[in-house]
Amino acid sequence: MAFLRNLKAVKGSSRVEVYGMPQWRNFEAIEPEYLTALNVHISSAAYLDYSMPSVKAFQQAFYEATGTLPDEDGFNGYDITLFTGKMLRQFGLSFPGRLSSQVFRGLRGDLRFAPVYTTTVPDDRSNQYDYLENMFVHILKFDKYGFVPVGN
């Protein structure tokens, strides 16, 4: 990317942090040297740590059942199904009303739902939200060989 190349050239010894788009994670044309030198960060709804025992166990079970390794949709489906099952067991059919009070840590990330109001009339929130949205997001930084969660 010309932008990163030019920024690296003009930054000199100054410390710079660049916040990019989640799509940058899959750009093979971006040199790792630029990502490191410019302290590139991106946001992501998901991050899989393949060294975690729970991720390895799911991969093994999925492979034994299907003969192939799970893709991103497989991990997402597992997390959503497990979360929904736990909510049903704990709250029964009334679980949708409890979504915003529960946090679930899945293989790909957390589920932290919050109500979203789209009404244009202020104070017209008579407990009727328009929908729930997962507010959790990973902030990833480039560290030598790939993107990792900030703090690791």
Question: How does the language model describe each region?
Answer:
Residues M1-N152:
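Extracytosolic ligand-binding ectodomains
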